[in-house]
């Protein structure tokens, strides 16, 4: 039905007759000539109909937005004065010779013009229309190019594309599982996989030493702009490769993607330990485009007569750190109060500040509500350490170390945006040497990555004796403050795996019930293995500049995990529930509802 895609017609086709199919993007009647902007997934081209062909002209005059049409016409160059540099096809137009309406369109329920606003609910309810818009179509096409490039790279490096089960067993991986009741085994449930983690490890044990899969994963968790209940991973696992080799190979793949699809040279990725990232940036996924860093000053304020500072400064678990913001002295009191309110979201109790109005005037050039608690020597040392200059502001965080890191790290990002401090387009890095475990709110321990991550250079006995000192052989790839992917060397013997389970409060009986198949498999010559999983949706979001992963998925869910298009989730047929042996507990209706 077509000879070319609309967006592919160019100056090389001048003088040729082409056949196109697509949708009417816009139609204009200017002085007895109909200009038709015709659109398909590859772009838009202008088709011109004049009255010399009365029957065709009459049909062209009747067209409305989103009519589905087929046209035949002659490609001709536009006059220089009419060239549209903003269009891929802007050097040419098509003189329409034939026109067939393949289907008409009812009045549209959403605005198709990119400059017109639609609500998120409208866009998802009429997603098939939303996806016709060029900016959305471009992202879906780009996504396909990314997955094709990933497959080419991995296939070319000896990786095998192997599918793993979707109906599997519930295992504790940090989020709630989506459960699927079994009709055959009444009262028992499958779980949709949060990741293929255990199956890809089992594939390593099976001898398939290089595996990959572009795979759907499912997590029943609270959603944010970069989270969906079902999402896609580029999942990779290898045997007989060290963490350094896995990082080198996946970095090569990532650099290749950016070069091929964006013509961007990312260069070699720097390394940073988890401890350094938290100390300097308050985040384990720092955005290195932002030049601001957290600066520790606990040693300077241990003796000051101000409990807000000296308390955390003398607490082994406390921290006092500052941000020095160039040009920040122009912040009004109201703006500073807004910053103080902002950090409370992250557990901070408030925010002290100090403006450097005139460095040459000494203490007289300093303005701060806490200045009365600070000696001239302390202020001088503070200015020297931060490098603050006239016109800058210093913001203080003082609390438990984890609160200071989270609150000041978030404030660092906000200030970087507010003061337009971000430099460069792309800043990748590897974050390494993560703690093996971290404390839970009730004082217990949980795995920072997952319970199958191996420690660096520790025996099972050493690990159980001092688990909080353990460093995992794990690595995260970070780009512009977003975690693109994370991975680790895996545990490959049953003694170490059992030790980790015990540290996490999983006794031997529970471990055998939930992970007996894994512990058994680890007994039969399991090779050393390691891997990494990328969040495909997040990669596409970053590469296309989209504001949400919903804008790079064909049919995403809302932030409440619903689908307005199909009205999912929905109620099950009572007959099906009986067959499954499932009864539904109706929510309680409160008085007045």
Curated annotation (Swiss-Prot):
It catalyses: tRNA(Asp) + L-aspartate + ATP = L-aspartyl-tRNA(Asp) + AMP + diphosphate. Residues 197-200 are annotated as: Aspartate. Keywords: Aminoacyl-tRNA synthetase, ATP-binding, Cytoplasm, Ligase, Nucleotide-binding, Protein biosynthesis. GO terms for molecular function: aspartate-tRNA ligase activity; ATP binding; nucleic acid binding. PROSITE patterns: AA_TRNA_LIGASE_II (PS50862). It is found in: Cytoplasm. GO terms for biological process: aspartyl-tRNA aminoacylation. Its EC number is 6.1.1.12. It comes from the Bacteria. Homodimer. NCBIfam families: aspS_bact (TIGR00459), PRK00476.1 (NF001750). This is Aspartate--tRNA ligase. It comes from Shewanella piezotolerans (strain WP3 / JCM 13877).
